[in-house]
Amino acid sequence: DDARMGYSLYNYVGGIPTSLVDPTGLHWETKDFWDHYMNGKGRTVTLKEIGLSVRFWMSIPVMTEVYEHMLAHSAYLKKKVKDECRRTNGRVGSFATTFRKKTVTDVTGDVFMTPIGNSTFFSEHRCMILPNCCEGRFEYTCSSHYYIRDWFENPFDIGLEHPKGTIYRINGDWHVPAKGSATFK
C-alpha cells in the first residue's frame, strides 16, 4: 500500500513493509499488552474484549488442537459406551459423561498474538449418551467448552518482571454444542 494513496495496512521500517496493522483499531497489539501490564493493575482481560477471540480461535495452531481434542473425545466416547455395555451386559440406559483434555497452543507466529504466545489450552466435554448395545451404536448430545487461562508476564523473556508492571490474566472461552450418533465395536 502506498501511503500517498490512503491509509496503509502495514507498519514500515526504512520504507519496507514489515507487518500488517489493524486499520479498525479493534484489537490489541503488543503495545496495548504492555500498556495494560504497566497501567492495568492486574485486571484480567478476555480475548473477546481485546478483539482477538476470532483470530485466536481461527488460527491454525488452535484449530489443530481443537481437532486433536475432538478426536480424543470421540475415541473416549466409543470406549466409554463399549465399557458400559459390557459392564451392564447390554442393559445400560442413558448416562452422562465428562471428558477433559489439556494441551498447549503456540500462536507466536501471528504478529498480533505474539504476546499471548504459548497458552495452556483446555477442553471439557459434557455429554448425555443413549447407547444401543445390540446394534453397536449410540446417540449423544454434548456441550464442549474450549478455553485458555493464560498470563501476561515476564515480558522481557529473561525471567524478571518490570518493577512497575503487574502480571495479568488473559482468558478466552468458546462453547460448542454437538448432537449426533456414532458406532462402536
Language-model region placement:
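Short turn/helix-capping motifs enriched in Asx and small/polar residues
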Residues: 1-28
